[in-house]
């Protein structure tokens, strides 16, 4: 069927610089993987040890800002004049769907192992204390604190969308109240947008780098096809081709249906793990972990370990705070767009409660299952990681469940669909951000979307070639540094403009 939707052209000043920068970095990495790994280790050490404290203070300050929004003068302000576009149930379900990416399935299953084997606060590895704090740290990293920071930025973007009626497709559009129209639309705004795009490209590449091995390991388990880097590259290529076909043939409705299937299948798979793994233990472990979280929360918030130098807060807390920072603008734009018509307080409470429930369910069920398999000596996670890699260890936590073949098919389909929708979202977001103003009824050009999906795929392959989690962690942390400042500027711009246009009556 023909469509009358218009296509908008690329914006050279934000299209070519990120393309060139990322292309050069990928080329330099592939030229010498060993040298690249040395640089990666140096960058990771410098940023986390020298500037890790800044990410921790950023999260705390944004949390204070959340309380100001909820209980301050803007709490009852509506984000747009229209009634809410979606029912509260649908709204929360859409937020849950945004949490069920393949990268989340990756971390949810294996993260607790790292916390138990290399615990914080001087605890002995694999001790009772380490196990007690393992899930508590997952609930900390994926709980109310980061979602509170996202809700603040979501309010900011919803304000610009629905109150100020701005067409926001890049962060520079929101900076006019802070730096003036001349700078926001000039060189300064262009630099901000390029920082945002380069960081977003690497973030999406890392998500693909986490997701792909899960699918290829599933293929090895189900079909006996050996997992190799070549197979990873082939699978990524197939996803890119599938995405191109979907876009070219106007199958975006099919992609949306796939996204819904992913959400329902996520509920089904989590329910299955919850029932067969040990529902009573999971609920008891969760309850105990919430208490542990509340007991250790002040130290977790500010833990940098300059005396013990264990490296735990740098490797995990700073890494995850950078992860949240780097995805903040993209996620907040999406969450803002589905929150039209709601009050500031409603958006803040809804996001923190709904999204915290989503991530806590994921991490509690999957993390508890991994811990049980380790405690019962069903799986030797360290040996699996040493001999076969992290992805194989994750697959084995699913394969160890009853009806293993059916379970693995469900997990395979879930990971495959999650990655297809990831690539589609990546290409669409990057294409929208690198084209001229895209208004209602317009779409970014097909070749631009395909081009960005290819580049994201290449980054995923490069990170897989480097091997291990450190390159992925470093890519996130390096990308999070510039966006740390961009997010702050967007926040300050909102506060400044709201004082003028949301005057107290």
UniProtKB/Swiss-Prot annotation:
Keyword line: Antiport, Cell inner membrane, Cell membrane, Membrane, Transmembrane, Transmembrane helix, Transport
GO BP annotation list: 4-(trimethylammonio)butanoate transport; carnitine metabolic process
Main location: membrane
Transport among keywords: yes
Membrane-spanning residues: 10-30, 50-70, 92-112, 143-163, 195-215, 231-251, 263-283, 316-336, 347-367, 403-423, 446-466, 475-495
Family indicated by similarity: Belongs to the BCCT transporter (TC 2.A.15) family. CaiT subfamily.
Protein name: L-carnitine/gamma-butyrobetaine antiporter
Annotated organism of origin: Salmonella arizonae (strain ATCC BAA-731 / CDC346-86 / RSK2980)
Gene designation: caiT
């Amino acid at each position: 069927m023909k469509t009358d939707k218009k296509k908008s052209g690329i914006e050279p000043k934000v299209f070519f610089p990120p393309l060139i920068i990322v292309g050069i970095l990928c080329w330099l990495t592939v030229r010498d993987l060993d040298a690249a790994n040395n640089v990666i280790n140096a960058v990771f050490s410098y940023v986390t040890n020298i500037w890790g404290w800044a990410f921790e203070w950023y999260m705390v300050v944004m949390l204070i800002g959340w309380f100001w929004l909820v209980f301050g003068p803007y709490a009852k302000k509506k984000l747009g004049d229209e009634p809410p576009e979606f029912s509260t149930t649908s709204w929360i379900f859409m937020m849950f769907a945004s949490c069920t990416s393949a990268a989340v399935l990756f971390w949810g299953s294996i993260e607790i192992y790292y916390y138990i084997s290399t615990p914080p606060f001087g605890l002995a590895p694999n001790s009772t204390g380490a196990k007690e704090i393992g899930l508590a740290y997952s609930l900390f990293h994926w709980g109310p604190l980061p979602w509170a920071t996202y809700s603040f930025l979501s309010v900011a973007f919803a304000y610009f969308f629905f109150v100020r009626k701005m067409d926001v497709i890049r962060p520079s559009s929101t900076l006019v109240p802070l730096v003036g129209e001349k700078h926001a639309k000039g060189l300064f705004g262009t630099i901000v947008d390029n920082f945002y795009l380069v960081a977003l490209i690497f973030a999406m590449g890392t998500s693909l780098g986490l997701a792909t091995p899960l699918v290829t390991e599933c293929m090895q388990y189900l079909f006996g096809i050996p997992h190799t880097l070549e197979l990873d590259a082939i699978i990524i290529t197939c996803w890119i081709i599938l995405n191109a076909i979907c876009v070219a043939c106007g199958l975006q409705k099919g992609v949306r249906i796939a996204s819904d299937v992913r959400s329902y299948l996520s509920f089904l798979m989590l329910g299955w793990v919850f029932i067969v793994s040990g529902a009573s233990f999971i609920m008891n472990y969760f309850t105990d972990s919430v208490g542990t979280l509340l007991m250790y929360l002040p130290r977790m918030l500010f833990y940098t370990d300059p005396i013990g130098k264990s490296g735990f807060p740098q490797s995990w807390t700073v890494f995850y705070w950078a992860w949240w920072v780097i995805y903040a603008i993209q996620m907040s734009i999406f969450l803002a767009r589905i929150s039209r018509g709601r009050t500031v307080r409603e958006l803040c409470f809804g996001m923190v409660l709904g999204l915290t429930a989503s991530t806590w369910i994921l991490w509690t069920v999957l993390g508890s299952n991994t811990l049980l398999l380790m405690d019962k000596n069903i799986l030797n996670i360290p040996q699996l990681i040493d001999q076969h890699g992290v992805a194989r260890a994750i697959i084995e936590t699913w394969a160890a469940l009853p009806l293993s073949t059916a379970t693995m098919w469900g997990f395979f389909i879930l990971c495959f669909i999650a990655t297809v929708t990831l690539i589609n979202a990546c290409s669409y977001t990057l294409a929208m951000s690198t084209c001229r103003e895209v208004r209602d009824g317009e779409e970014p050009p097909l070749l631009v979307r395909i081009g960005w999906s290819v580049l994201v795929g290449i980054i995923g392959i490069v990170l897989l070639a480097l091997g291990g989690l450190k390159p992925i962690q470093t890519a996130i942390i390096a990308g999070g540094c510039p966006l740390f400042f961009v997010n702050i500027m967007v926040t300050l711009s909102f506060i400044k403009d709201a004082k003028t246009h949301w005057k107290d009556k």
